[in-house]
């Protein structure tokens, strides 16, 4: 009985070795035909943590959970008219350029304002701009830029303006049922793999439409079919709320609006978080305003009455004066911003990193000393 069991174990082991050998040969052939990294075991992946690029807004980075837009993914930004969709996307463009990357803007709406983009921090001399004649042309241009691997961010503004060539060539009133949806579905199938491979961030701006005859539930939908909804790793719903009034002589003038950005879909962090930002007309998202609000909630900036203080030093009476102080002192702004990001776990604390490095160095030194002692003990000196 024991002999029979042993033979069975030997057969199982031999069969298992042959299967493993066959698998190893298959993996080698796949890598030979399609390149290294075409297939791998999940635990062997070099990068486990999702790489991100800051959105250009601290509040939005926190709401996204990972600290910004994930690289190699598709992002959809949608909302009503004049809600701030393009502003949010342009802040991403400015951030990509700030980090030394190259950004492209596919302006299908033919409505990009260069002076406004420059006011938001975009280097318009370095920005790649295309104003395509049709939806196919715009998506083809985006595809070629992504395939090059040289572009870090591509913004398409907007999906609703990507009109199929057949519709442009036809007459007004002609029926083109599902034409744009089929075009977008094909584009998503072609672009998604290339976007992931080149680690390019693709931002699609979209509009809203109303579904006819909806009695219950949300009647709002986005044009372009369902493909973009499925392929997008992050979907942002941008809504403008109350108007912001000016101060002093401009107290009756609208100088901006409070905007809510809701993360309605997120594949890299928990969804449904919200970011509240102030979009100032002609300036974009108020970075000092959102920093003061978040830092005050975390008690990094202390508020007593109308006064704001940091490190026991008063920085301004009222939020406007505090904003001005941070704008005039970028080193203080950066210091507070870093503390907030550390609190939310978006970045590692420098002091903790230095302590970990010192501890690791100490352990390595101890191991080297132990090995040296063992070698010294083993060596016999002959006279």
Curated annotation (Swiss-Prot):
GO molecular function: ATP binding; ATP hydrolysis activity; ATP-dependent DNA damage sensor activity; damaged DNA binding; single-stranded DNA binding
Coiled-coil region(s): none
Record-level GO BP terms: DNA recombination; DNA repair; SOS response
Cystine pairs: none
Compartments, record wording: Cytoplasm
Entry binding sites for ATP: 79-86
Pfam family, one: RecA
Domain of life of the native organism: Bacteria
SMART domains (alphabetical): AAA
GO cellular component terms, semicolon-separated: cytosol
Keyword line: ATP-binding, Cytoplasm, DNA damage, DNA recombination, DNA repair, DNA-binding, Nucleotide-binding, SOS response
Location (main, coarse): cytoplasm
Xref: InterPro entries: AAA+_ATPase, DNA_recomb/repair_RecA, DNA_recomb/repair_RecA_CS, P-loop_NTPase, RecA-like_C, RecA-like_N, RecA_ATP-bd, RecA_C_sf
Sequence similarity: Belongs to the RecA family.
Function (record text): Can catalyze the hydrolysis of ATP in the presence of single-stranded DNA, the ATP-dependent uptake of single-stranded DNA by duplex DNA, and the ATP-dependent hybridization of homologous single-stranded DNAs. It interacts with LexA causing its activation and leading to its autocatalytic cleavage.
Matches recorded under HAMAP family: RecA (MF_00268)
Protein name in the entry: Protein RecA
UniProt lineage: Bacteria, Bacillati, Bacillota, Bacilli, Lactobacillales
Gene name for this UniProt entry: recA
């Amino acid at each position: 009985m024991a002999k029979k069991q042993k033979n069975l174990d030997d057969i199982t082991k031999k069969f298992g070795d042959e299967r493993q050998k066959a698998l190893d040969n298959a993996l080698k052939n796949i890598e030979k035909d399609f390149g290294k990294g075409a297939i791998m075991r999940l635990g062997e992946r070099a990068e486990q943590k999702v790489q991100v690029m800051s959105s250009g807004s601290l509040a939005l980075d926190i709401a996204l959970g990972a600290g910004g837009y994930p690289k190699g993914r598709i992002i959809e930004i949608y909302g009503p008219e004049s809600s701030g969709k393009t502003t949010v996307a342009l802040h991403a463009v400015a951030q990509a350029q700030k980090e030394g990357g190259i950004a492209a803007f596919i302006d299908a709406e033919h409505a990009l304002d260069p002076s406004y983009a420059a006011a938001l921090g975009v280097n318009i001399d370095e920005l790649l701009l295309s104003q395509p004649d049709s939806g196919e042309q715009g998506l083809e241009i985006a595809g070629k830029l992504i395939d090059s691997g040289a572009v870090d961010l591509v913004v398409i503004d907007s999906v609703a303006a990507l009109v199929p060539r057949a519709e442009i060539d036809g007459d007004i009133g002609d029926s083109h049922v599902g034409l744009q949806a089929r075009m977008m579905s094909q584009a998503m199938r072609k672009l998604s793999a290339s976007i992931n491979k080149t680690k390019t961030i693709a931002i699609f701006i979209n509009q809203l439409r109303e579904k006819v005859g909806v009695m219950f539930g949300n009647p709002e939908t986005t044009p372009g079919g369902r493909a973009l909804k499925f392929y997008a790793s992050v979907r942002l719903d941008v809504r403008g709320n109350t108007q912001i009034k000016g101060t002093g002589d401009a107290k009756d003038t609208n100088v901006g609006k409070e905007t809510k950005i809701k993360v309605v879909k997120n594949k890299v962090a928990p969804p449904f978080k919200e970011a509240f930002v102030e979009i100032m007309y002609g300036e974009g998202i108020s970075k000092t305003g959102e920093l003061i609000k978040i830092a005050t909630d975390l008690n990094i900036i202390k508020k007593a009455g109308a006064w704001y203080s940091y490190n026991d030093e008063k920085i301004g009476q009222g939020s406007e004066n505090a904003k001005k102080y941070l704008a005039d002192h970028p080193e203080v702004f950066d210091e507070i911003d870093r503390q907030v990001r550390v609190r939310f776990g978006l970045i590692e604390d420098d002091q903790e990193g230095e302590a970990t490095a010192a501890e690791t160095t100490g352990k390595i030194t101890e191991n080297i000393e132990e090995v040296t002692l063992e070698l010294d003990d083993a060596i016999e000196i002959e006279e």
